[in-house]
Amino acid sequence: MKVSDIRSKFLQFFESKGHTVVRSSSLVPANDPTLLFTNSGMVQFKDVFLGTDKRPYVRATSSQRSVRAGGKHNDLENVGYTARHHTFFEMLGNFSFGDYFKREAIQYAWELLTKVYQLPADKLWVTVYAEDDEAYDIWAKEVGVPADRIVRIGDNKGARYASDNFWQMADTGPCGPCSEIFYDHGPDVWGGPPGSPEEDGDRYIEIWNLVFMQFNRDEQGTMTPLPKPCVDTGMGLERIAAVLQHVHSNYEIDLFQALIKGAGRETHIADLNQNSLKVIADHIRACSFLIVDGVIPGNEGRGYVLRRIVRRAIRHGYKLGQKTPFFHKLVGDLVAQMGEAYPELAEAQSRVVEVLKAEEERFFETIENGMSILDAAVADLKAKGGKVLDGELAFKLHDTFGFPLDLTQDVAREQEITVDEAAFDAAMTRQREQARAAGKFKMAAGLEYSGEKTVFHGYDALSMDGVRVTALYVDGASVDTMQPGQSGVVVLDNTPFYAESGGQVGDQGTLVSGPAVFAVADTTKIQSDVFGHQGTLANGALKVGDTVAAQVDAVRRARTVRNHSATHLMHKALREVLGTHVQQKGSLVDPDKTRFDFSHNAPLTDAQIRQIEEIVNAEILSNAPTVAQVMPFDDAVKSGAMALFGEKYADDVRVLSIGTSKELCGGTHVTRTGDIGLFKIVVEAGVAAGIRRVEAITGDNALHYLQSLDARLNEAAAALRAQPSELVPRIGQVQDQVRALEKELEKLKSKLASSQGDELAAQAVDVKGLKVLAAQLDGADVKTLRETMDKLKDKLQSAAIVLAAVADGKVSLIAGVTADATSKVKAGELVNFVAQQVGGKGGGRPDMAQAGGTDPANLPKALAGVTEWVSAKV
């Protein structure tokens, strides 16, 4: 039974039992800052269990995408080395919100496992909480599980209700006993039943956990029965698939085998049992779905976890000899396996490929140098008998070459050494403190100030003369005089500079007083009505009480206001096209773009994006005036002005009317909509469950973007000798031609392999009754080498053969040994004998092995030594 069938049968079964099939929520938990990633099926129903949310159904079932990497739940270091650890997995679950309870939950589970999945009942064991007689009796008396296969588990974690079979969401709140179902793999696998000293073995594998939320636990630890008990169950799809497909490792199921084959294809590795291929296959799932849900590689939070996973996959590819980006090429394989179940993956395929490729290209620029340093350090350490790698070196690899600590630890573990984490942490802390000291002038919000307020004039002016310096700060401390070259913060009594707020970035510009010139890099608020002008004093001295001429960077401001005004028009258009459920969830307006996050539960279609662009550009063409009014908050709301949910507003607010848009806004804007010039959406993506993101550009940025697209379109048309209007059908013709040529090429390669096989067979040397052949095939690829190898083995009947090819400075090697000779000559050893001489390594089965190398100059010598090497073996 394929993974896709197992998933669909689960959902269909519970749907037939009155459950609503609920789509998987985002891997980025909505409104839960305590959780890095969604790591179980119940996460999207947490508020329902807590009683703070209600759904239109009381029974639900789902297949939830989940990630365990980073934070409390982190399986990253074990992935690829064990049978069942993954960064990404799917959790099948059924849920009852005050509807059915233990009896139905247990009966449903048993029916699905034994009737739908047809697992042998005598292979299933169950556990119950020691005091849960109700669950025990249901299993024993109603389901009919023999008593010797029902295990009571008590408080085995050192405290009351601290048990593998008692679940609690937190120290207080909903909790209750649980019942776990185990599958017995049989006596050929070591391990004991749950609750026994040997329970950590692999014979008895947990496949399903049924949680019965029965009590509410208060701060004193008192358990009070819930008026409406709930059920939360979870079954790992990969685990149950391994059971149903009669394999012991999750990596042997059909879904993973397809991804592992893809990883082998892209890394040119024939031995699909290598742990590195398992790592790559696992990581493409986690990385792709994180990107689908709006996470992008970065240096903090979720983005850094994603970067760590991507770079771990790249390192394992590098370990296999892959020196160019390959990881992003597996997205297509993943879509083929999971795109039907998760259409959002297929829809985001090109974006996922783009993000992964960019991250790969970035890391491949440094990985070779970093690995050279790391390999040398490890070799030196082992030569000296050491066991702990210097943490300072690990930090250098992190800081200079982009090696996450766990990547270095991964390499160290393979060499049976560890990394000094304490020294790494100390180096990291030291760097952060230095950065914090260097950047103190940026921390305007933390400065102490008790002087007069700043009066903002930037709605009407970009420059002002005679404004007074009321305070100066250097390194976070108040000073009377700022010296040339110092960075700090200047506070003025009046200013045309807009201070960052409401998503709009702060202004840049200059403050000039005689010879003193202060370059303003940013403007932020020290207090709600006190502006801090952050920057560096280029020359001269500046004192408190000096008067300065303040000049805002007019070009930068103009680009920013175009983007801000366009944001308002876009918000209105989004509500018009998608519905009034659209609410702003965040924004960033800078000179380059506007980024707008909003509530919506589906990706925008191309047609919707075009419609939004048309609405906004029509507003721009109308050249309507922008009108700003200050009025009481209640009056503003009554007038129809949109306010942001959860935002705190003063008694009097500024209402901005631009075109048909009307919002509360304190930002700066164009005078008329025509000043925006042009509007173009360039990015649409998901960032969290029910949250979408749009990025757009305006004015000259939009014009340059479209000109660039036009230029590339013309280049493509010229390359295909077609007019731009004929490009699509011309591409179709070229694709047809390519496919036809590829078929013809395959035929020619097959003929070549056959003819070369005949010619090469005559070159074989007899060594003690075994035919030995080592040859280089010019122009051959790996497939041709394999086909030629098969023909030679058939023709020679008893032989040891090495075939090689060189392309783009890289060596491809295939070794083959006929079955009668594998007891004396192993193909894996033979191919490694040659590979080591050409800067590579490889492996495979005793009868067939593959390798690669990077030094083709040594290939003739290496091939010449094959006969002598085989002679020594036989």
From Swiss-Prot:
Its cofactor is Zn(2+). Zn(2+) binds at residues 564, 568, 665, 669. It is found in: Cytoplasm. It comes from the Bacteria. GO terms for cellular component: cytosol. Keywords: Aminoacyl-tRNA synthetase, ATP-binding, Cytoplasm, Ligase, Metal-binding, Nucleotide-binding, Protein biosynthesis, RNA-binding, tRNA-binding, Zinc. CDD domains: AlaRS_core. InterPro entries: aa-tRNA-synth_II/BPL/LPL, Ala-tRNA-lgiase_IIc, Ala-tRNA-ligase_IIc_anticod-bd, Ala-tRNA-synth_IIc_core, Ala-tRNA-synth_IIc_N, Ala-tRNA_ligase, Ala_tRNA_ligase_euk/bac, DHHA1_dom. Transmembrane segments: none annotated. GO terms for molecular function: alanine-tRNA ligase activity; aminoacyl-tRNA deacylase activity; ATP binding; tRNA binding; zinc ion binding. Its main location: cytoplasm. Binds 1 zinc ion per subunit. It catalyses: tRNA(Ala) + L-alanine + ATP = L-alanyl-tRNA(Ala) + AMP + diphosphate. It holds the Pfam family tRNA_SAD. One of its GO terms (biological process) is negative regulation of DNA-templated transcription. Its EC number is 6.1.1.7. Belongs to the class-II aminoacyl-tRNA synthetase family. Catalyzes the attachment of alanine to tRNA(Ala) in a two-step reaction: alanine is first activated by ATP to form Ala-AMP and then transferred to the acceptor end of tRNA(Ala). Also edits incorrectly charged Ser-tRNA(Ala) and Gly-tRNA(Ala) via its editing domain. Consists of three domains; the N-terminal catalytic domain, the editing domain and the C-terminal C-Ala domain. The editing domain removes incorrectly charged amino acids, while the C-Ala domain, along with tRNA(Ala), serves as a bridge to cooperatively bring together the editing and aminoacylation centers thus stimulating deacylation of misacylated tRNAs. This is Alanine--tRNA ligase. The lineage of its organism: Bacteria, Pseudomonadati, Pseudomonadota, Betaproteobacteria, Burkholderiales.
